[in-house]
Amino acid sequence: MTQTLADMRRDYTRDGLTEAQSPQEPFALFHTWFEEAVKTEQPPVEANAMTLATVDEEGRPHCRVLLLKGLDAQGFTFFTNYESAKGRQLAAHPFAAMTFFWPALERQVRIEGRVEKVSAQESDAYYQVRPLGSRLGAWASPQSRVIADRDELEGLIRQTEQRFADTQPHCPEHWGGYRLLPERIEFWQGRSSRLHDRLNYRLINAKWARERLAP
């Protein structure tokens, strides 16, 4: 018999998450979890894949999967076309949320905060280490705009290849990075019978406060 959606579930059986196991600030815990995800998750799961949520001018939410490309004491960095839908939304409402899910570890991390552009130098530094096809694509693709068909996109790629046939492409002004400056980070560890562990960190007056949330 075909399994119904109502019957689709799994019980989580890995270790829990206690306050004694957790540091007073969230970045150290995220680093630990991320390193474990890199070692544990297998393709097609990418440990640095996350869902980014933004809102448009009408307050309607939009979400999509991106790759985390930078992490430091300031926040979490990703790159995109500034003229894309997400870029326009962040220009109007510079706040976002991101979620990481690592199924092999039965873990999830939710992050919320203000978003700002990184410097042009930081954007260029990352752009230059991307594969050539990706660098050309940043010039060729009018991201999030309506196009006629795949042939139109292929034509734009050919034009861009011809444009940069004798030189390396440089980082376009309409493409670059954003850094999410976290104000809230929640760590979720799956537990049996849906009685999950949730440790929530909130930034209050430049200091992190830790609290446990009911599942």
UniProtKB/Swiss-Prot annotation:
FMN binds at R64, V65, L66, L67, L68, K69, F79, T80, K86, Q108, Q143, S144, W188, R198. It catalyses: pyridoxamine 5'-phosphate + O2 + H2O = pyridoxal 5'-phosphate + H2O2 + NH4(+); pyridoxine 5'-phosphate + O2 = pyridoxal 5'-phosphate + H2O2. It is an enzyme of class 1 (oxidoreductase). GO terms for biological process: pyridoxine biosynthetic process. Binds 1 FMN per subunit. It comes from the Bacteria. Belongs to the pyridoxamine 5'-phosphate oxidase family. Homodimer. Catalyzes the oxidation of either pyridoxine 5'-phosphate (PNP) or pyridoxamine 5'-phosphate (PMP) into pyridoxal 5'-phosphate (PLP). This is Pyridoxine/pyridoxamine 5'-phosphate oxidase.
